[in-house]
Each structure stands twice: as C-alpha cells, then as structure tokens.
Amino acid sequence: MKIDLHNHSYYSDGFLSPSEVVLLAKKEGCDVFSLTDHDTTDGLIEAQQQADKLDLKLIHGVEISAMWSNMTIHILGLGIDINNETLQKGLKQHQEFRQLRAEKMARGLGGAGVFGALEKVKLVAKKGMITRTHFAQMLVQEGVCKDMRSVFKRFLTGKKPGGVGGKWAEYDEVIGWIHAAGGKAVLAHPLRYRMTNTKVRRLLNHLSGADLDGVEVVTGSSSSDEITLVSQWAKEFDLLSSIGSDYHGWPNQRVRIGHLQDMPQVNEMVWKDSSWLN
C-alpha cells in the first residue's frame, strides 16, 4: 500500500491546484494521500471532490507553523475536522500574520533594489496566501538569482533584506488546535531545521511532553541513514511514525508524490487504530 501524508497545492506554496495534486497522486499509485497546505484548509473541499471521483482515500490535513525555543517548526495536523472552530481561529491568526510578513518582506527587498516585489509575487501566488517560496520563485523568475538556494542565502533568511522572523503560536498551542479538531499532531521533517541532532532530540522531548502524537520518519528527501535515525527517535520518545513526500510541484523541484523509501517496520504508524486505511 502506497501512503503519502504530506503534500501542498497552490492554496499555500504548491504549484498545482488541489484537484491536480490528487489526480497526480492517483496516477503515481497512492492509495492513501493527504493534502497539508501551510496554515490553511481551504483546498480540502476541492481535493475531496476529486478524491471521491478517483476512489482515493484522502486524509484531511494541514501544516501549521509553530514556535519552539524562538525557532520556527512545522507541525502536521492529520485526520482533522476542517470545520472545527478552534483550529480555524488559530489558522486565521497565522494567515493574517503571513499577509503582514509578505508586506514587510517586499519592503525589505525594495530597499535592496528589488522594486515592485509585492505586485510581482502576487502573480506567482495564485490563491492569495503569499509564502517565502513564492518570493523565492519570483526572484528566480525575475533573474535576480539563479536558483532557490541562492535566493534564501542572499535575501530571505536571518537579517537579509527579505528576512522576517516568525510570530507563530507556540508549539503546545498548535498541538492543542490539532487535537481539538480530532487530528494527529506530527512533527514535519525533523532533520530540515537548522539544529544539531542533539537539539532535535531536545525538540522531540519537549513536544512529546506536550502530547505530540508522531514524527515524520520518511520524507521525499530522506536518506537511508536519516530514516534510521528518526525511526530510533520515534521509538525513544514513544511517537508514532509518519511518511510524506512534502511535494510542492514546482518545475524546479525534484520531489515526486508517492516516491518514498520504505518505512521501518519496527515503528508504530500514525494511522494505527484509525479508519484511514478502510
């Protein structure tokens, strides 16, 4: 059975529509699939309609930014009720911050000689939510930088011209939103943060103490050694294991839906004791 529980559409920083993402998931052989846009569930109704046509099991999801030790992390909410008031109230706060952040980023880029950044990035972001990925893609398309890596290095991190710090809800609050909506809270891509392995272990220890349910053991960019390491951490902190490609669909990105290494069979899966596989 092919399962992919971390993917994006153009309702956040993905390239394709929800329908197109679901259609591609079916084409790539997925049996169970989740759409997990950043801080929004707006694409899930369209995704569900397409999944029903294709007889594909869709798990309603979201990827929520959160603060831990003054650092931004991402927590997936899987199997959520998208009509839950607590969840939607929290997501609205984040959406409002994203708009303010985009305006600040554009002003910073203007000061560095990239003029009209906000107007240009709006043409890249198809559904209103503007993310750092949209700014990065815009700067590549404008020929300011040659690739995404150089954009972030020159413009979008730390004290660079377009670097704007996060002001997200704290991790325990975000976990609470997800649980209020009946979902599983899963730390996304634990090895992608700018942390040493020792610090990631401390992160997992803190989050597991705040009732985190699971951790993403397998991602679309994971090496075998990374999978083994995160699998060990999942067992150490009594966390369920999840799997997801983190597909965005931009032409200059290599990750593909459903093309994932195998999950270690010694781990308990995040879909344990759920109806997700029915």
List each language-model region with its residue ranges.
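Acidic, carboxylate-rich catalytic segments that either coordinate divalent cations
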Residues: 259
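Extended substrate/RNA-proximal surfaces in nucleic-acid metabolism proteins
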Residues: 50-201, 205, 264-277
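An N-terminally biased module of ancient metal coordination in phosphate/nucleic-acid-related enzymes
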Residues: 1-71, 155-158, 170-252, 263, ...
